[in-house]
């Protein structure tokens, strides 16, 4: 860790300017809820009018789901040292079931706060942590089971229903192919009551720690839009606090719905505080990583007491969900012996080593109900880790993987007994024809708790391109019912990702998630596709760029060969040129049909050609031949 950089950060930290630039052609808008403090952000993309050559009409703006937070709102002054605006404190306080702690309940937190050498690293947080009052449960699942619709639930309903509301207004763009949802219960409209019922049933979670008041609420569940997670975090080999905050804001800009801080290097506690205070998206962690650092990396020295203190430490900071590898049981470890790649999960290998060293059952499993007590006191959601996931397609769907999954199903029911929100982590490396079995088995044994998968990677032959090998599997499992997809960057298996890698991974997974929404037939999912297709046909180049997931790259690729501004109104691109543009030719066919008195509305191009008066066309060609001298051949 570079101390001089950290000193600068704690005194004069500044946000990455690339992360706070509004998207070209877009503006941040807010939709008001039933109360003044429910303001749901969306990104509205302005569109040009259709050119007169194509009928000349107004194109209404298109609203899209926005994960970029206050960072792209020009009205919000971003100051990393102060953190993001408080959204949820009033909602939490009015429920009357929490108390403010006079001091941290974590021994480790108190030690860090008492260490003067860390002063230059600390985020200047004046607010004290909250916890449930004795005997109280503050989870969104607990409220949902009691029939309470929280402000978080209303916020989410507005956010998820955004495209549905707009579709009804846009006429020609509202056509959508029926999907195949594989038994998902996707309604025609997302209401606050539907959100409540899905959370109560355990089919969806709202990761929203009561100490993460900067959070813009979101939901993870198979009957909602497919979400994606981006990973950040330092390591022993490098990266500063400043770089991790930068990766957070950058990932959220491009579409990360949640972010996991997987730091394993120095100053994990301080790094996480900076991240959470400047994050509007849910933050997840793997607490066993930090617990391992506390015992100098020696897995055998881990204890329940150290792990418990780590959970409290992170819950007080505001971590929204914990990956906990409680399903790695002693009896499953021998099942991995003949695998090609053994145990590839860091958390899984840590717990397997502990189990073998002590020849005792996993303490995360034996203390699971005590963990639930901590989770419900702060509303931290479980992400039950797949510590025995396959690390190669050769090991996919084996006894170790599915044995652990069965145990995760048992633990899910225990968590639900405590009203603790729970999702299940999944593989991994799985060839395409074996992916659906994973989804079907998870739905069965985990009673439809949300599934959250890393990919899966569909082949192992493409280091450097694993964002693509996994994006294929992610799109498929998202279609089958997976609720959240954990991104993979081009650096997977090779190194720590930088900003460029983070963006590439996020965009790849946004494509996969959206493709899954289309395949499921999620209402309103096709609106953006239709708007972009219409812009493409009408050669509205700027609208094409702005409607895309990555306007910057689309614009740059176009400008490599046609850099002049005049090219952005041309009726062709560099792929086919002016004479061979299929869309230009199609429009000419339509124009000709109109001249012949053929109504082209709703007619396919093949039908259109057949309906043109062939005899009239032949006569026209005969006239041209005679006027040109009736010569059989002409010099060229």
UniProtKB/Swiss-Prot annotation:
Enzyme class: lyase
The organism's place on the tree of life at top rank: Bacteria
Catalytic reaction annotation: 5-amino-1-(5-phospho-beta-D-ribosyl)imidazole + S-adenosyl-L-methionine = 4-amino-2-methyl-5-(phosphooxymethyl)pyrimidine + CO + 5'-deoxyadenosine + formate + L-methionine + 3 H(+)
Required cofactor names: [4Fe-4S] cluster
Cofactor note (record): Binds 1 [4Fe-4S] cluster per subunit. The cluster is coordinated with 3 cysteines and an exchangeable S-adenosyl-L-methionine.
GO terms under cellular component: cytosol
Transmembrane segments: none
Name of encoding gene: thiC
Assigned keywords, A-Z: 4Fe-4S, Iron, Iron-sulfur, Lyase, Metal-binding, S-adenosyl-L-methionine, Thiamine biosynthesis, Zinc
Residues binding Zn(2+): 429, 493
Binding site for [4Fe-4S] cluster: 573, 576, 581
Function: Catalyzes the synthesis of the hydroxymethylpyrimidine phosphate (HMP-P) moiety of thiamine from aminoimidazole ribotide (AIR) in a radical S-adenosyl-L-methionine (SAM)-dependent reaction.
Entry EC number(s): 4.1.99.17
Subunit structure and binding partners: Homodimer.
Entry similarity comment: Belongs to the ThiC family.
InterPro entries found in the cross-reference section: ThiC (IPR037509), ThiC-associated_dom (IPR025747), ThiC/Bza_core_dom (IPR038521), ThiC/BzaA/B (IPR002817)
Region Disordered, annotated ranges: 48-70
One GO term (biological process): thiamine biosynthetic process
Residue sites binding substrate per the record: 231, 260, 289, 325, 345-347, 386-389, 425, 452
Pathway: Cofactor biosynthesis; thiamine diphosphate biosynthesis
Protein name: Phosphomethylpyrimidine synthase
Alphabetized GO MF terms: 4 iron, 4 sulfur cluster binding; carbon-carbon lyase activity; zinc ion binding
Keyword Ribosomal protein: no
């Amino acid at each position: 860790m570079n101390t001089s950089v950290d000193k600068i950060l704690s005194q004069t930290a500044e946000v990455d300017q690339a992360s706070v630039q509004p998207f070209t052609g877009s503006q941040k808008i807010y939709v008001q809820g039933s109360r003044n403090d429910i303001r749901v952000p969306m990104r509205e993309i302005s569109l040009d009018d259709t050119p007169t050559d194509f009928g000349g009409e107004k194109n209404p703006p298109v609203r899209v789901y926005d994960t970029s937070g206050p960072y792209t709102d020009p009205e919000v002054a971003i100051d990393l040292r102060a953190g993001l605006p408080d959204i949820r404190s009033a909602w939490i306080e009015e429920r009357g079931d929490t108390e403010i702690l006079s001091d941290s309940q974590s021994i480790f937190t108190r030690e860090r706060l008492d260490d003067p050498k860390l002063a230059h690293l600390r985020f200047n947080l004046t607010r004290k942590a909250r916890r449930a009052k004795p005997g109280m449960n503050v989870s969104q699942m607990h409220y949902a089971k009691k029939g309470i619709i929280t402000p978080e639930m209303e916020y989410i309903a507005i956010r998820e229903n955004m495209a549905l509301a707009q579709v009804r207004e846009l006429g020609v763009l509202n056509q959508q192919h029926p999907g195949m949802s594989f038994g998902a219960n996707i309604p025609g409209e997302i209401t606050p009551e539907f959100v409540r019922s899905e959370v109560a049933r355990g089919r969806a979670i709202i990761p929203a720690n009561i100490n993460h008041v900067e959070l813009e609420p979101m939901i993870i569940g198979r009957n909602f839009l497919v979400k994606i997670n981006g990973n950040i975090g330092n390591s022993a080999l490098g990266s500063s606090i400043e770089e991790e905050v930068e990766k957070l804001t950058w990932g959220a800009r491009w579409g990360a719905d949640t972010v996991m801080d997987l730091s394993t290097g120095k100053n994990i506690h301080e790094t996480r505080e900076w991240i959470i205070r400047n994050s509007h998206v849910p933050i997840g962690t793997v607490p066993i990583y930090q617990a391992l650092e506390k015992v100098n990396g020696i897995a055998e020295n881990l204890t329940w007491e150290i792990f418990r203190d780590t959970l409290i430490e992170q819950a007080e900071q505001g971590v929204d969900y914990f990956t906990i590898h409680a399903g790695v049981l002693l009896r499953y470890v021998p099942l991995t012996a003949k695998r090609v790649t053994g145990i590839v999960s860091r958390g899984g290998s840590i717990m397997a080593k502990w189990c073998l060293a002590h020849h005792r059952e996993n303490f995360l499993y034996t203390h699971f109900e005590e963990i639930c007590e901590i989770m419900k006191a702060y509303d931290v959601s479980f992400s039950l880790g797949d510590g025995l996931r396959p690390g190669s397609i050769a090991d996919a769907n084996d006894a170790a993987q599915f044995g652990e999954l069965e145990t995760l199903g048992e633990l899910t029911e225990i968590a639900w007994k405590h009203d603790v929100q729970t999702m299940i982590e999944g593989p991994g490396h799985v060839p395409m024809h074996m992916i659906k079995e994973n989804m079907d088995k998870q739905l069965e044994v985990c009673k439809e708790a949300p599934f959250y998968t890393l990919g899966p990677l569909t082949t192992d032959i493409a280091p450097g391109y694993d964002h693509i090998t996994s994006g294929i599997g992610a799109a498929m499992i998202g279609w089958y019912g997976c609720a959240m997809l954990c991104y993979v960057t081009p650096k997977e298996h090779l190194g720590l990702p930088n900003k460029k890698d983070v963006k590439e991974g996020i965009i790849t997974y946004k494509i996969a998630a959206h493709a899954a929404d289309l395949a499921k037939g999620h209402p309103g999912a096709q609106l953006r596709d239709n708007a972009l297709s219409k812009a493409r046909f009408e050669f509205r180049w700027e609208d094409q760029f702005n409607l895309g997931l990555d306007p910057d790259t689309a614009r740059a690729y176009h400008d490599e060969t046609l850099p002049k501004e005049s090219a952005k109104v041309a009726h062709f691109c560099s792929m086919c040129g002016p004479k061979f543009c299929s869309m230009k030719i199609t429009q000419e066919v339509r124009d000709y049909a109109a001249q012949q008195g053929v109504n082209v509305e709703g007619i396919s191009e093949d039908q259109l050609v057949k309906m043109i008066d062939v005899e009239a066309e032949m006569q026209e060609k005969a006239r041209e031949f005679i006027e040109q001298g009736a010569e059989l051949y002409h010099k060229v």
